[in-house]
Amino acid sequence: IAIYLKDYLSDKELKTVNKYIKKMHKKFIKPEEFLEKEKGFYAMGNGGIPNLAYAHWTNNKKLAAKEFNFRFKNIEEVFYDDGYINNNSFRGFRALWYHSYGLNSALGYIYLAKNWGAKVPELVMNRITKAAEVLNLGITDYESFSSRKYDGKQKNNQYKKHNARKHTHQEALAIDT
């Protein structure tokens, strides 16, 4: 929200906010800003959106470019050619929810990339588009969606019938319409 107020801050206020933002970046974002995440795609563009917020505040186009390149590579790794998402799409009865969660986060990230003028790689767009098709499959034919087996190891999944609730992520507004 501070970015919307930046032009209206006095020099003293701007100095205070800058100091605060730099400290917060150093303490909370910097330690994890480019961690390799091999499984899934989750909140805040899988951790990339805080980098973009900081890059925007500091007008650091190099940081933004590095972030986009890093996160696009991450999307290429965890979004499969067939539209399923590593880890997200294979969480038992929670798979549809986690699939929509990852897809929604990636869609938001791509929207930000386009607003920055970044070129989104064709492979990323193809995999995101396919993931949207898989989400629609999960909504219309859950059995077909869940028939794809995961070739990795799962630690956090639910396969007990009483836990079944086929739904999309509550913050992925209108993703299922």
Located regions from the model:
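Aromatic-lined, polymer-binding surfaces characteristic
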Residues: 1-117, 125
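CBM-like carbohydrate-recognition segments
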Residues: 120-177
